């Protein structure tokens, strides 16, 4: 619904650049607290999101850790240059590396509950989601990386 939601093309050559640019664009549009949420986290609730916005009043960064070592949510109340765009993603040390960088910058951080995000077929099982495919190869084509 174009009257209710604004849509924007993501800009950047990789995930980190796209996330960083999203924050830059939103702050340029005069938003004062911004939260990015991954679309592959089925257990996220409105209470978690509300808690994130609440904690941004007290902290520089909020992070929702994912069980696989990444994160499903990140929020800021001001842009932090190159926090997200100069790093690699898709490995189990993503969260730890980001938290190290946040600490090096002397930023305060609040961690939301750890949740599962869906990256591979086993993640569906862990989340209690069952999807039946006629052909097992259809999983990779339709859901997998």
Predicted features, each with a name:
Residues 2-33, 91-94:
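Short phosphate-binding loop-to-helix
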Residues 35-37:
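Short aromatic-hydrophobic micro-motifs that form the base-stacking/packing surface
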Residues 39-41:
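Short acidic donor-binding/metal-coordinating loop in glycosyltransferase active sites
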Residues 44-69:
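Conserved donor-nucleotide/metal-binding helix-loop-beta segment in metal-dependent transferases, i.e.
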Residues 67-82, 89:
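Conserved catalytic core of nucleotide-sugar-dependent glycosyltransferases
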Residues 80-101:
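Short, glycine-/small-residue-rich phosphate/pyrophosphate-handling segment
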Residues 96, 100-145:
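Conserved alpha/beta core of the MobA/IspD/sugar-nucleotide pyrophosphorylase nucleotidyltransferase superfamily
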């Amino acid at each position: 619904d174009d009257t209710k939601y604004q849509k924007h093309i993501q800009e950047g050559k990789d995930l980190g650049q796209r996330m960083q640019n999203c924050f830059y664009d939103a702050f340029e549009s005069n938003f004062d607290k911004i939260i990015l949420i991954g679309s592959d986290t089925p257990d996220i609730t409105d209470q978690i999101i509300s808690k994130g916005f609440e904690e941004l009043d007290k902290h520089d960064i909020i992070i929702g850790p994912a069980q696989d070592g990444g994160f499903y949510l990140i929020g800021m109340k001001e842009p932090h240059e190159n926090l997200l765009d100069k790093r690699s993603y898709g490995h189990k040390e993503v969260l730890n590396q980001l938290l190290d960088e946040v600490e090096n910058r002397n930023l305060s951080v609040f961690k939301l509950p750890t949740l599962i995000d869906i990256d591979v077929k086993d993640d569906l099982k862990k989340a209690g989601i069952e999807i039946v495919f006629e052909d097992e190869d259809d999983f990779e084509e339709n859901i997998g990386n």
